[in-house]
């Protein structure tokens, strides 16, 4: 797994072409109308759908008011610097409603559940499950075979660029609604209890709980049984 440097991310955002993509349903005398250099138009008779940049399509609509009877615009972002990750070739299970930005690394057989938000530079290891409504901030790094519980937040660090990101090592289980703050490393095989706020590093194979989170015990057989990672959920 490769962790992106903060300055790489800053440069990527700074130099990206900002985009306001739209989908426009249009009706009228459409033959011969140029909707813009970036546009893809699917026209059938006097109706059609156009995909492209709003600045170009808006100009075409204004210049052809006499021909266009009606139109409806679908738009979900404005001057966006970072596109969404292309999911088609990711060897993972990604459920509807997950928001995953470009420049995110997702390992094979990972699971991303509904409502998860994963920011640029994040890394998700093989076989790791990111549960519903989890937030992975910029550069948050999660190892292999982890479970990040529903509603948890792994804080992001892009600025200041010198700051250390959150690192979750392999085989970690984080309970629902836990928060791991910037710069924290959670060691291999550790368990973070539900609702904990983790402000300091967590030793491997320990259990932490509370606000702020503190060690309550070492991992034992009972804890292993309660936090078992089921590979059946990760099969494609």
Curated annotation (Swiss-Prot):
Q: What name is this protein filed under?
A: 2,3,4,5-tetrahydropyridine-2,6-dicarboxylate N-acetyltransferase
- Enumerate the PROSITE patterns for this protein: HEXAPEP_TRANSFERASES
Q: What does this protein do?
A: Catalyzes the transfer of an acetyl group from acetyl-CoA to tetrahydrodipicolinate.
Query: GO MF terms on file?
Result: tetrahydrodipicolinate N-acetyltransferase activity
Q: Which InterPro entries match?
A: DapH (IPR019873), DapH_N (IPR013710), Hexapep (IPR001451), Hexapep_transf_CS (IPR018357), Trans_hexapeptide_repeat (IPR050179), Trimer_LpxA-like_sf (IPR011004)
Q: Which gene encodes it?
A: dapH
Superkingdom, natural source: Bacteria
What catalytic activity does the UniProt entry give for this protein? (S)-2,3,4,5-tetrahydrodipicolinate + acetyl-CoA + H2O = L-2-acetamido-6-oxoheptanedioate + CoA
> Per its UniProt record, what PANTHER family does this chain match?
2,3,4,5-TETRAHYDROPYRIDINE-2,6-DICARBOXYLATE N-ACETYLTRANSFERASE, ACETYLTRANSFERASE
- Per its UniProt entry, what is the enzyme's top EC class, as one word? transferase
| Species, as recorded | Bacillus subtilis (strain 168)
What protein family is recorded?
Answer: Belongs to the transferase hexapeptide repeat family. DapH subfamily.
Q: What is its EC number?
A: 2.3.1.89
């Amino acid at each position: 797994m490769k962790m992106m440097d903060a300055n790489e991310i800053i440069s990527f955002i700074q130099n990206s072409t900002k985009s306001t993509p739209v989908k426009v349903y249009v009706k009228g005398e459409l033959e011969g109308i140029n909707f813009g250099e970036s546009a893809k138009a699917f026209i059938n008779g006097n109706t059609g759908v156009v995909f492209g940049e709003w600045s170009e399509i808006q100009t075409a609509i204004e210049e052809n008011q006499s021909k266009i009877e009606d139109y409806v615009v679908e738009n979900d972002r404005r001057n966006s610097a970072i596109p969404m990750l292309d999911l088609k070739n990711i060897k993972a299970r990604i459920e509807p409603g997950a928001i995953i930005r470009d420049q995110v690394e997702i390992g094979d057989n990972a699971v991303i559940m509904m409502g998860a938000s994963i920011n640029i530079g994040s890394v998700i290891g093989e076989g790791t499950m990111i549960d519903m409504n989890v937030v992975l901030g910029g550069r948050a790094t999660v190892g292999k075979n982890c479970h990040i519980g529903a509603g948890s937040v792994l804080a992001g660090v892009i600025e200041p660029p010198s700051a250390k990101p959150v690192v979750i090592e392999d085989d970690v289980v984080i309970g629902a609604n836990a928060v791991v703050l910037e710069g924290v490393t959670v060691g291999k095989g550790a368990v973070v209890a539900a609702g904990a706020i983790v402000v300091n590093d967590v030793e491997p194979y320990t259990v932490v709980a509370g606000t702020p989170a503190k060690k309550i015990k070492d991992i034992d057989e009972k804890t292993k049984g309660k936090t078992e990672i089921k590979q059946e959920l990760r099969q494609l």
